[in-house]
């Protein structure tokens, strides 16, 4: 089934609201094997909405509209769809009674314009709205399906899951499932080059995407049997792992910090961190993970040289000779936080996140990450690009990846 989404609302065109509905719907429809080829945003204008409907009606089997179901004069979606299809608007008594009950619950009386929301194109299947006053509806005409949904996500999402998803599932006999392989330490172009033959596969498909400092490969398989689909995905994942190897750090929703915490817990080891350029972001990422308290002993943000010297015990001579952003300082920060916290590992970050502070010798983006065990200290020099936020985020990923690699017995690059 070929589908598209028309999002109605001038506020979307003005950038006042982020269109999260289109993202949500596309993801859910993909699971049903429905291919979404077009997203359209249109303002609260009858003629322009009709133009969009005309285009969509000629190229798609399924058209979903979102927004424009409120009680005000600029809420025109149902009226415009009805006019486009040549259908009269008919009052639905159950919907009207539901609107009255909704207002009774909140101790208010509906105004006459609220009852506009109880009118639907003739023959439409009504979609109840348990979270608002704007029911949706489904219209089947000329072998096409038009689904009209409210704009607020708090209303659209429950309506879709309770009413629309089961309806569409009955109309399709194909399922799509995806798996996301997360890769760190290789750029997008390198990953694409390595897996290039797989990118031409038709089922399952493999698509590279860039995250914030990492790369993903999305495997998407389509079929009629869940077991068959899962086997296709697992076979493709195995092929990708054979090519990419240890640069793969997680699958689907799992994040780098979760991987590291699980490895520390599994090995009953502890970690402490001393941060400069990341300003507490590393500790935050770690403590975002439930159960981190079992393996995370201490986090120190030693932003100034005085803090590095007085709290962490970095030697004054080191700071004077090499500076705060140096191999030597990162080494001492990692060593000393490990000892201070009585932890198995110490992890440090020091660098120039910008936009100011760089010099020809030490430009913005220069970062050192230190990792201390009871036997050895590793220091990794990085030259990172991007704004201040990106440099900090990427530094944290590099730092956590060093710990991951060490715990898995993988060479630290």
Curated annotation (Swiss-Prot):
Highest taxon in the source lineage: Bacteria
Pfam families from the UniProt entry: CinA (PF02464), CinA_KH (PF18146), MoCF_biosynth (PF00994)
SUPFAM superfamilies: CinA-like, Molybdenum cofactor biosynthesis proteins
Family membership noted in the UniProt record: Belongs to the CinA family.
Name of the molecule in the record: Putative competence-damage inducible protein
Organism lineage: Bacteria, Bacillati, Bacillota, Clostridia, Thermoanaerobacterales
């Amino acid at each position: 089934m070929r589908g598209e989404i028309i999002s109605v609302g001038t506020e979307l065109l003005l950038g006042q609201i982020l269109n999260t509905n289109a993202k949500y719907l596309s993801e859910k429809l993909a699971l049903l094997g429905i291919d979404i080829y077009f997203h359209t945003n249109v303002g609260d204008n009858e003629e322009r909405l009709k133009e969009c409907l005309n285009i969509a009606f000629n190229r798609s089997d399924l058209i979903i509209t979102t927004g424009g179901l409120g009680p005000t004069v600029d809420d025109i979606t149902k009226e415009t769809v009805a006019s486009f299809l040549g259908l009269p608007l008919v009052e639905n008594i159950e919907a009207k009674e539901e609107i009255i009950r909704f207002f009774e619950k909140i101790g208010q009386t509906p105004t006459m314009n609220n009852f506009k929301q109880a009118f639907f194109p003739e023959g439409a299947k009504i979609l109840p709205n348990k979270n608002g006053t704007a029911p949706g509806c489904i219209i089947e005409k000329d072998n096409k399906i038009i689904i009209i949904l409210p704009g607020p996500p708090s209303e659209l999402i429950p309506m879709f899951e309770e009413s629309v998803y089961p309806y569409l599932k009955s109309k399709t006999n194909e399922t799509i499932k995806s798996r996301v392989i997360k890769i760190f330490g290789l750029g997008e172009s390198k990953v694409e080059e390595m897996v290039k033959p797989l990118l031409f596969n038709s089922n399952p498909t493999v698509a590279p995407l860039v995250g914030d400092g990492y790369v993903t490969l999305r495997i998407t398989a389509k079929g009629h049997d869940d077991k068959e689909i899962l086997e296709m995905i697992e076979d493709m994942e195995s092929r990708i792992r054979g090519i990419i190897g240890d640069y793969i750090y997680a699958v689907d929703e799992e994040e780098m910090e979760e991987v590291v915490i699980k490895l520390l817990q599994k090995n009953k080891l502890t970690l402490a961190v001393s941060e400069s350029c990341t300003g507490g972001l590393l500790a935050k990422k770690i403590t975002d993970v439930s159960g981190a308290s079992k393996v995370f002993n201490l986090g120190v943000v030693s932003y100034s040289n005085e803090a590095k010297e007085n709290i962490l015990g970095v030697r004054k001579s080191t700071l004077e000779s090499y500076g705060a952003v140096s191999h030597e300082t990162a080494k001492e920060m990692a060593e000393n936080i490990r000892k201070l916290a009585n932890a198995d590992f110490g992890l440090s970050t020091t660098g120039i996140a910008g936009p100011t502070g760089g010099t020809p010798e030490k430009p913005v983006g220069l970062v050192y990450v230190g990792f201390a065990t009871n036997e050895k200290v590793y220091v990794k020099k990085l030259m990172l690009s991007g704004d201040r936020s990106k440099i900090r985020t990427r530094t944290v990923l590099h730092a956590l990846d060093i710990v991951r690699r060490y715990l898995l017995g993988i060479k630290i690059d």
